[in-house]
Amino acid sequence: MDYKAIAQQTAEQVLAYNQDLSGWKLIKSSKKVTVSSKTSRIFHGNLYRVEGIIPESAAHLSDFLFKHDHRVSWDKSLKGFNVIHKIDSDTLICHTITQSFAMGSISPRDFIDLVHIKHYERNVDIISTKSVDFPGYAPTSTYIRGFNHPSGYVCSPLKENPAYSKLVIFVQTEMKGKLPASVIEKSMPSNLVSFLLNVKDGVKTYRIPPIRARHSSHSSVHKKKEGHSAIKP
C-alpha cells in the first residue's frame, strides 16, 4: 500500500472540502463554535464541518494537533492513542480508541488512521486523516473497528489577528456496527463542539514554545532533564 500517495490525496480532498462552501446546513452553534453538515458523497452518512477560533498561531496549532503529545489528556473523546508507525516526519499511522458516547448507546470504537500534515501557501496547514489497513493491527473482538473517510483539520491565520487561528475540522466517520443513523446524527453535533473546545483548552494547557525559543533553550532544558530516564520527544 502506497501510504504516502494516499496521504497526499487525502490532504487534497480535505482542501477541496474547505474550499467548497455550497450545500452546508448549519445544525448547531454553541460557545462560538459552529457545526454544519452535508450528505457524504463517499458513504451513507454525513460530512461534518466544525469551525471555531483558537487563540494561538496557525503554526503552533497545527504543530500541537499533529504531534499528538498529551492527546489522551486533552481529547476527552479518546481512551487510547498510539503512533504505531512513522513513515516520515510528516506522515504517521496511528491507533486510536474512542470513549463510548451518546450516554453509552455508542460503544467504544478503534481506528487505524493514516495522519499527514501538509503546508500550503499563506501559512495554511492541513492535517489529514484516513483509515487504512496496517499489518499486525487487524480488527479484534474487543472493539468495533470504525473507519474514517477523508477527514482532517485546516489551520489558517485569522485575517483580523494573525496571532489567532481559524480552525476548520472535517469529520466523515463510519461508525460501523448496527447503529441507527438517527443515533449518530443526534449525538455528533454536541460531540464535535466539545472536541473543538477540547482543542482550545489543550493547546493553551500544553502550549508549545516558539521554534526559535526551543532551539535557544535546548541546552538548558537538557541539563534540567538529564537525570530522567526517559524524555518525551
Curated annotation (Swiss-Prot):
SUPFAM superfamilies in UniProt: Bet v1-like
InterPro entries: StAR-like, StARD5/6, START-like_dom_sf, START_lipid-bd_dom
GO biological process assignments: lipid transport
Every START domain range: 1-208
PROSITE patterns the record matches: START
Composition-biased stretches (Basic residues): 213-226
Keywords for the protein's UniProt record, in alphabetical order: Lipid transport, Lipid-binding, Transport
Gene3D superfamilies recorded: 3.30.530.20
Expression sites by tissue: Testis.
GO MF assignments: cholesterol binding
Record keyword Transport present: yes
Disordered, as annotated region: 213-233
Biological role: May be involved in the intracellular transport of sterols or other lipids. May bind cholesterol or other sterols.
Protein name listed in UniProt: StAR-related lipid transfer protein 6
Organism: Mus musculus
